[in-house]
Design a protein with these regions (language model features):
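A short acidic (Asp/Glu
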Residues: 30-32, 201-204, 288-292
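Short Cys/His-based metal-binding microdomains
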Residues: 23, 27-33, 37, 145-175
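Conserved, well-structured core segments
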Residues: 15-21, 27-30, 218-221, 229-236, ...
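E2/UBC-UEV (E2-variant) core
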Residues: 236-285, 291-318
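Active-site metal-binding core of divalent-cation-utilizing nuclease and nuclease-like domains
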Residues: 123-154, 178, 182-243, 253-259, ...
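Acidic carboxylate-rich catalytic motifs and surrounding loops in phosphoryl-/glycosyl-chemistry enzymes
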Residues: 4-12, 16, 192-198, 274-285
């Protein structure tokens, strides 16, 4: 599945569930006894009825059964958390605690848990799947050049921040278009890269983007309140970039949001008489705080319009965005990073 032999430590990592930022391929050698004992406890009351040859289930205590299941789930979760903490402390090699933390972000593992539906693009070929696993755990990607087209030493982290080839722009534009498509379902007057009203006279003291050609990525009406125009600016950051390693992923997203707010918020409020929402994402699938609030609001409005469950809409949104980011990452990994090859 991985395409190579793995170490004992890597096998332990892969055995943890996706919600712990891992892979979810359990090791039956380690979990067989625990799962058997759990099965015995869950079926104990039913087994006793069978032994006593009861003809109906009137003596079957369903409430007690539910309590047993609940306690087993709690115990299992505690066991997995201990395993996760132990593995995180013992990590050596390319996979770091930072990788584990990034992979635990909400929605980061949605590409592993969704149905592989080719009709909506929720599937990878063999090489793409293995490359995705390597990116997820910081492993070396097979058959990639030692040096980047820009002349620097090649690595996954360098590939995802190298401007040559236009892949950073492609990643941004793809996510911008996905968000615009979501908004068209429930918002009005959706525009991509709308021009802002020029600053004149009394507005010359406004901080942030002052140039006449300034434009955020998207604008639309009706998300936060009826008729209100909101501007959005998208940014996808790679949190394992060398300049970010001293900052936690959550702090990094908040910092980048503040930078976006300083650039556009005052102009959106005072000149456009609208509002501004920064949409920050990471290459691992994490969302910034304001992006999370935005998607919750969007999912709520879509679910009410389509009569679907909110959880289903939100899950679809997370999966769609995750695949959008993942595909742009995979293209950058295998693409040519030459200066003359500008895309976008």
């Amino acid at each position: 599945m991985i395409g190579r032999k793995i170490s004992d430590q890597e096998r332990k990592i892969l055995a943890l569930p996706v919600r712990f930022g891992v892979f979810g391929v359990t090791n039956p050698v380690e979990c067989a006894d625990r799962e058997y004992n759990s099965s015995v406890l869950v079926t104990k009351s039913l087994t006793e009825l069978l032994y006593s040859q009861e003809k109906d289930l009137k003596n079957y205590d369903r409430e007690k059964q539910n309590e047993v299941v609940k306690s087993l789930k709690t115990a299992r979760e505690a066991h997995l958390l201990r395993q996760y903490n132990d593995i995180s402390q013992q990590l050596t090699g390319p996979t770091t605690p930072r990788h584990m933390e990034l992979n635990r972000e909400k929605g980061a593992g949605s590409w592993l848990t969704c149905l592989p539906l080719s009709s909506v693009g929720y599937c990878f070929n063999k090489r793409e799947f293995r490359d995705s696993i390597c990116v997820r755990y910081g492993w070396k990607v097979k058959d990639t050049p030692t040096y980047c087209g820009c002349g620097k030493r090649n690595s996954v982290d360098h590939t995802l921040i190298c401007p040559n080839g236009g892949y950073v722009i492609m990643r941004h534009n793809n996510l911008r278009d996905v968000n615009a498509e979501f908004q068209k379902e429930v918002c009005h007057d959706v525009k991509v890269e709308p021009m802002l009203i020029p600053i004149e006279g009394e507005n010359t003291q406004i901080e942030g983007a002052k140039e006449d050609g300034a434009h955020p990525d998207i604008s639309s009406r009706g998300l936060w309140s009826p008729f209100e125009r909101t501007f959005y600016d998208v940014q996808v950051i790679h949190p394992n970039s060398p300049s970010y390693l001293d900052t936690t992923p959550k702090q990094l997203l908040v910092q980048k949001e503040k930078i976006k707010m300083r650039k556009y918020n005052v102009r959106a409020l005072q000149v456009e008489k609208g509002t501004f929402t920064p949409l920050l994402y990471t290459t691992f699938g994490g969302w910034g705080p304001q992006a999370t609030a935005y998607h919750r609001r969007l999912a709520d409005k879509i679910s009410k319009k389509t009569k679907e469950e909110y959880a289903s809409v939100m899950n679809h949104m997370r999966t769609r965005i995750r695949f959008s980011i993942m595909r742009s990452v995979l293209v950058a990994l295998r693409g040519q990073h030459r200066q003359a090859n500008n895309i976008g």
